[in-house]
Amino acid sequence: MTNLNFRLAQFADIPQLVDLINKSYREQQGRSWTTELEFVKGQRITELQLKEQLQLSNSTLLVGESNSSKIVACIGLTFENNQVEVGTFCTDPDVQNMRVGRSVLEYAEQYALKEVPHLTNAVMYVLDVRSELIAYYERRGYVKTGNEQSYPVEANVGVPIKLIEMKKDLK
C-alpha cells in the first residue's frame, strides 16, 4: 500500500488524527511495532494539543490518505532556521510493514525542502528504549547525534527514559 494521497491536515481531521496517533503510539501492543505502551502511559495527544499544533505558524502537519480517503498516516514538521524537526509521525498499525511509513517520511522531507529550500537537515527525537525504531530511522539516513534529553517529567512515565536526537542531512 504505497499509493497515498498527501495533504495538509485540517481542523476537521482532528478527531480522526487523535484516534490514529493514540492508537499508533499507545495501543495495539501486539500488532504495532511502534507502540510506546510498555514505556509511556496515557494519551499521546489530545484534541486540544493537536488544535494548538495546527495553529503554529512554523509547523505543518501532513496526512497520508488511502484511496478510500481514510487517514492512515501523519507527520509533523516544525521549521526553525535551517532545520526541520520531524514529529507526530505515525502510521495506522493495520498498514504497517507496507512501506507507508517510508513513503510518508520521504514525502515529508521533500515537502520540507520545497517549502524552505535553504534547509540543511532534519532532526527528530526518539525514545532511547526503542532500538528497532532507531534502527529504522538509521536505515532512512538519520544518525544519532549524541544529544539526549530526559523524557518530560510531567509525562509521569515511571521508568526513566531519554529522548535521543537523530539528524539527517537534506542537502
Where are the regions that the model predicts?
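A short helix-loop-beta-strand connector motif used in the catalytic cores of GNAT acetyltransferases and
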Residues: Q43-V63
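Conserved acyl-CoA
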Residues: S103-N121
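C-terminal "cap" of GNAT-fold acetyltransferases
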Residues: H118-K171
